[in-house]
Amino acid sequence: MKRCALLTPLLPLALACNNPNDPAHSCASIYSVSSDEAASFCATFTASVVSEPTGVPDAFLSACDSKIKHLSSACSCLGPVDSATATPVPATSTVPASVPVITTSTATATPSRIPVFVPSSSSSSAVVTFKTQIKSSSPGPSSSFAAAATTEAPTSTRASPYTPYTGNGGTTCTVTDYAGISSAVASCSNIMLSDVYAPPSSTIDLQDLQTGAAVIFAGKTTFGDTSDSDFDPIVISGTNLTITGTEDHVIDGNGQAYWDGQGSNGGSDKPDHFIVLKHVYNSVVANLNIQNWPVHCFDIENTESLTLTGITLDNSAGDEPNDSSDGDPAAHNSDGFDIKSSTDLILKDSNVYNQDDCVAITSGTNITVDNMYCSGGHGLSIGSIGGKSDNTVDGVVFSNSQVVNSQNGCRIKTNEGETGEVSNIKYENISLSGISKYGIVVQQDYLNGGPTGEPSNGVSITNVEFTDVTGTMSGGKDYYILCGDGSCENFTFSGVSITGGSDDSCNYPDSGCP
């Protein structure tokens, strides 16, 4: 029977939680040993509303280094809390409401925090398991799941029953060895990559997938060391695709082999983009669990009608310094989703734990980012804009999202001395907590090495709405707007209230900061 598995013991893999049986993970251990006591404060302790660890027992504070992010993450890994008392939990994995799925089960799944895809355990389609050899057969019909990607703004759903994806009816091939991937791509319409290890300098190349193909990651996908900034570990292209994972899978980017606190700004060579989606059309990427990527995670470019949903990105292992990072967090430039030159894209219902932009859009049109949970990074960003082959962003909505324990909340950044256009941007219903630098920031003096303090006006920024953006700062400025001469126009603020910062500065609009 095909079923939706929603069991709490699976959370450590789904969220890349620490092993409570490992003595090195004292925070996870105390939650496991004293789960009842933990549940009593986890019911109300969420990073979306807590900026100080008040009410947390001393033993938990000691084991978790008094860090809100560690406490909150461990609460998430503990499992579901009482819905009668809990505040809203981070965004969870859900299929877009407009995307039909195939189901053969009449069982009702119990809602949980991490609903996940479970591939078919039996099928009338041919099933071929192989290492380096496969049998070919005709592909089945294209997946209606993938073909139904929509540009309509999705409805936010934080926890709901989930129907597993059961394949597209064509040949299914299970790959357990890297050498078998290319043959499967050429011959199969359903491809399961099970516990695949990609050797050094070996890309998981999914650029020639059949139209309507499905790729399902199972077990643990791992990679050898490749010290090359031009190397992309996973590359995906195609039309009407479904890219997803089983309930217990994890894709591990081996970031610890590269992290040196410098990311792509220097230090050792490291893969600059972990997963590249390019020339992907009318497709769905759903329910992937990814951890420990070296630098940028998703590089999404030249796509059309693409939906990404239910994705958990966890790079929190890079928060701590290592021997190479000179006291700084080991991971750096660890953007979650970088989007460029894409049209009609939906990113929703996903969690990002990282050290840089949760989402960064540098070019594209008609993009919706909804129901995100962003922790530890640089917030929800437009930019940086300027100095690239495509420098136009038009029609972006960020909505119904939480940004916690991060450097920035809502950010628009344009490069000093460059040209481009940013228009029709909306931030609505965004909750901020523990923001250390800027709650809302628009700056036109940005450079990767540091802002110049002198804004330029080569990039126009017009028709920007901030609606119901609320929350608290742990320091820094609530608002910072630094526009070039005449380059900002028609900014509106409604229901905006950010507190806890100081020395706000806004040279636009004329009325000053909100």
UniProtKB/Swiss-Prot annotation:
PROSITE patterns membership: POLYGALACTURONASE
Gene: pgaD
Function: Involved in maceration and soft-rotting of plant tissue. Hydrolyzes the 1,4-alpha glycosidic bonds of de-esterified pectate in the smooth region of the plant cell wall.
Organism encoding this protein: Emericella nidulans (strain FGSC A4 / ATCC 38163 / CBS 112.46 / NRRL 194 / M139)
Protein name per UniProt: Probable endopolygalacturonase D
Signal peptide from the UniProt entry: 1-16
Annotated disulfide bonds: 173-188, 358-374, 483-488, 506-513
Entries under SUPFAM superfamilies matching the protein: Pectin lyase-like (SSF51126)
Swiss-Prot/TrEMBL catalytic activity: (1,4-alpha-D-galacturonosyl)n+m + H2O = (1,4-alpha-D-galacturonosyl)n + (1,4-alpha-D-galacturonosyl)m
